[in-house]
Amino acid sequence: MASSSCLKQGSVPMNNVCVTPEATYEAVVADPRLFMTSLERLHSLLGTKFMVPIIGGRDLDLHKLFVEVTSRGGINKILNERRWKEVTATFVFPPTATNASYVLRKYYFSLLNNYEQIYFFRSNGQIPPDSMQSPSARPCFIQGAIRPSQELQALTFTPQPKINTAEFLGGSLAGSNVVGVIDGKFESGYLVTVTIGSEQLKGVLYQLLPQNTVSYQTPQQSHGVLPNTLNISANPQGVAGGVTKRRRRRKKSEIKRRDPDHPKPNRSGYNFFFAEQHARLKPLHPGKDRDISRMIGELWNKLNEDEKLIYQGKAMEDKERYRTEMEDYREKKKNGQLISNAVPLQQRLPEQNVDMAEADLPIDEVEEDDEEGDSSGSSGESEPHDDQSIETDPELEEPSLNPSGPNLNPNPTEIVVAPKEKNGDVVMETSPLKKADEPTVAVTAEQN
């Protein structure tokens, strides 16, 4: 049977697309080859892409999908009655196809929805009631892309109110130039300043996406054309009405830390049972904490009342312990014995702030004196192997430490050994780090 088409470029309603079915509904159901031939020709006339989908490594049987859907009254009736699972159950998919139900529905709307309208309803002289009620329910063909309006109709939502800018500003500014400036950006849109004529407005530019709708993008929308759902609102509260807020996770720094001296909360009977079973099952099932928790919950539900009393008794003892410790904790806190937010004492060595005596001795004489190895008996200087030797190099000088631990004296002093002068005397000076008015003690040792 010959077919005719009145398809034109652009968005054309279904009533303006004249497609005569090549065969009856019973004929295409009985003959899969006739079905595939007529389906390919329909997509060719409409200018839409056609290809057999592959799910789980296998070609999808479009003929079977069409028969299963139309035998139940069509896709709209199935979705309204929520019987799509019946259609999915007739197919056998591999385990890797986890979203088979969604994929089947997606391919039906893109490949078989128009075929159903022409061969199933019009062949029988039936027009879907939804198509007669509103023109928006009719499928539209936009330059080779199908808009699945039937699926959008099945998903209902409440439209958000829009602000008519011309009515808001008055009819005198309807033809004025509009200049917009983006002041800031946030997760769901932009903060903008719009100048219309002599009026300046501040608001929010955001995209309204209802939670239960499926958005479809046409090629025209991908080339800088703003969708019709973009609104300029004079009230920033419009963002909350159109965009679902995300739940913000609190940072660790925002969580109030518990007092370390606070008693450990009491545990329930299940907590004791969980700790006991977790220690037993963890070596048997490494890396499966979630499964272990599920198994422990099942084991707890299988316990009788007498077995649970054992753990509930432990819980009562722990509750009494918590009550006693809390009373003691409150009493200490009341008397001021607890130091909250206590930190360990930070100790560090004092900074080096010493006055080095300058040596007038030439370099040659210093080297000669070093070779002689002269030392004074009163200074206690001995061989370098002795632990009590005094180094003469000021760069290797370190502060003296208390043998029993760090020196906590707030005004420590340091022993400074100056290089040998011409007369061979050793000058030892003690200079305070903080108090400048204390006397300086000098010890002079004459050379033997």
UniProtKB/Swiss-Prot annotation:
Residues 219-270, 333-352, 366-448 are annotated as: Disordered. Residues 29-120 form the ARID domain. It holds the Pfam family ARID. It is found in: Nucleus. Keywords: DNA-binding, Nucleus, Transcription, Transcription regulation. PANTHER family: HIGH MOBILITY GROUP B PROTEIN 15 (PTHR46691:SF3), HIGH MOBILITY GROUP B PROTEIN 9 (PTHR46691). Belongs to the HMGB family. This is High mobility group B protein 15. It comes from Arabidopsis thaliana. The gene is HMGB15.
